[in-house]
UniProtKB/Swiss-Prot annotation:
Residues 262-356 form a coiled coil. It comes from Caenorhabditis elegans. Disulfide bonds: none annotated. Keywords: Coiled coil. This is BUD13 homolog.
């Protein structure tokens, strides 16, 4: 590939036979596309070809760098569009006039079945000239729609491509007032070649020209067509929460109402004083039933009980509990020693004291000795049961507590305690009392026999 200067020189030179032959050959071979596509003459210069050509000056090197950045940006924008869904601005549709629309042809989005072949040079139009490439043509003297080309809607017509409209030649004054070049959108008669750099919709693929950028102008004539999208590629709108003011939002404060973050000691002291004064004022204005002011102190007995703080009810309760404890202690203190044994021991001591008080000599008619001998009951006495029953009735008449007793024979024990009156006569003991009595009887019998033997042999 030749450089840009050589290409322009060749392009501006008069037509030759070789050029006509080459042109006819191209027209004969190009039979695949069904329509006509209008592009700039230098659009077929690809980026890959620009890498291999000879770089003549710094300006051309800068232009190549711009092309590389444009291709890289197109790839990034394509991937970015696939990642995020665009949020379009609300569309306001205005009524359109019945007259035909003479605005420039709109571009259409590329179809999914587009041709991925490399770019081809466009056919020569009847009204084309051999002048250098120009930016896209907009009529400066037209009173029709001068709005930028629109994007194709999803519900647009999917009919076969139609031949493009003819674009008239512009005047030099209109070209001088133009804004920087924009990327051209795909036309109805465009081929399905790979997508080009679409950073600017109405620009061609040639290196950008150095031209002073002029501000966008608005036409005075009213445009009744629907609103179009911006010429620049709009990035997807990210809906974010509006960040509230950190000074007025509670997120910048602690649970106590103080400000968080890095502060000086003076600010902390002032804020603490203000908060303390605010709380004191709020407590003073609060009702006594809510705040608990002037209320009597209630002490918990188990946790906060102290000496000298008992009430009258507590003192009376304490006295009752002490008295009952002494009674139970007096009643059960001898249960581990045997109640019957203690009573017998007490009666024996009283009898010993009485005998000690009697005179040394005792006569036959001693009344105390005779009464004692009458009260003693013997097992062999036939009158023993009658006397025992008489004594029982006498005790009941005196109002004494008399328990019923068992009437019948039972195995004797070392304490001489009779079984209860409800006993059924079955011995349920472990035999300890019987063994103990047998051992005691054997010992007594052996002693008696030993004593008799000694008396006989002496």
């Amino acid at each position: 590939m030749t450089s840009k200067a050589d290409y322009l020189k060749k392009y501006l030179s008069p037509a030759s036979g070789d050029i006509e032959k080459k042109k006819k050959k191209k027209n004969k071979d190009k039979n695949k596309p069904s329509g006509l596509r209008l592009i700039e003459e230098d659009a077929f210069l690809s980026v890959d070809a620009a890498k291999t050509r000879d770089i003549g000056s710094d300006e051309e090197r800068e232009e190549i760098e711009v092309l590389k950045q444009s291709v890289k940006k197109a790839k990034v924008v394509h991937g970015f569009k696939q990642t995020f869904a665009e949020v379009d601005a609300p569309k306001v549709i205005k009524p359109e006039p019945l007259s035909p629309d003479n605005s420039p042809p709109r571009g259409k989005r590329q179809r999914h079945d587009s041709d991925n072949s490399p770019p081809r040079p466009s056919r020569k139009r009847n009204d084309s000239d051999n002048s250098p490439p120009r930016p896209s043509r907009n009529r400066h003297d037209s009173d029709k729609d001068n709005s930028p080309p629109r994007r194709r809607r999803h519900d647009s017509d999917n009919s076969p491509p139609r031949p493009s409209r003819k674009i008239r030649e512009e005047s030099p004054s209109a070209r001088n007032r133009r804004s920087p070049p924009r990327t051209r959108r795909d036309r109805h008669d465009s081929d399905n070649s790979p997508p080009r750099n679409r950073s600017r919709r109405d620009s061609d693929n040639s290196p950008p020209r150095r031209r002073p950028s002029s501000p966008a102008r608005r036409r005075k004539d009213d445009d009744l067509s629907p609103p179009r999208k911006s010429r620049k590629i709009e990035e997807p709108k990210k809906i974010k929460k509006e960040e509230p003011d950190s000074d007025t939002e509670t997120s910048g404060r602690t649970l106590e109402g103080k400000r968080s973050g890095l502060q000086s000691a003076r600010d902390l002291k002032e804020e603490s004083d203000k908060l303390r004064a605010k709380n004191s004022k709020m407590f003073e204005e609060m009702d006594t039933s809510v705040s608990g002011r002037f209320a009597d102190t209630v002490y918990r007995q188990k946790q906060t009980k102290k000496k000298g703080k008992d009430s009258e009810e507590d003192q009376a309760k304490k006295e009752r509990e002490t008295k009952k404890t002494e009674e139970l202690k007096e009643k059960y203190k001898s249960w581990n020693k045997g109640v019957a044994q203690i009573e017998d021991r007490r009666a024996q001591l009283e009898e010993m004291a009485r005998v000690a008080a009697e005179p040394m000599a005792r006569a036959r008619d001693d009344d105390a000795m005779n009464a004692h001998l009458k009260e003693v009951l013997h097992a062999a006495d036939p009158m023993a049961n009658m006397i025992q029953k008489k004594r029982r009735d006498t005790a009941i008449d005196r109002g004494e507590l008399v328990y019923p007793s068992y009437h019948g024979h039972f195995v004797p024990n070392r304490f001489g305690i009779a079984p209860g009156y409800r006993w059924d006569g079955v011995d349920r003991s472990n035999g300890f009392e019987g063994k103990l009595a047998k051992t005691e009887n054997t010992k007594t019998a052996n002693q008696s026999e030993y004593y008799k033997s000694i008396a006989e042999y002496e």
